[in-house]
Amino acid sequence: MKYDWNPDKNNWLKKNRNISFEQIIFHLSQGDIWMIADHPNQEKFPNQRIYFVVVENYIYMVPHIIKKDFIFLKTIIPSRKATKAFLKEKEGKPWNLIEKKKKF
């Protein structure tokens, strides 16, 4: 599957978050996906899903929309909460990412 994104957003992500869509695509191609979920606010973001991508033991949430011929990546969000849950899972401990709050 092909990926697409806004080049201006990618430049902003590189400058402000020190990560890029190219890095995310590399990790997706390596299978570094912890989970995929529907966006929790489907009214505001219909048909949007979220990749939870593992980059150096840290979770980045990547909202995306699946189109006919490609997947459009919206942004990259570092997530402390998801990383904590991911690390607990790796240690074999129980976790619940959305128990306390519905938002990531």
Model-identified regions with their sequence ranges:
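Ribonuclease/tRNase effector modules and their secretory precursors
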Residues: 1-104
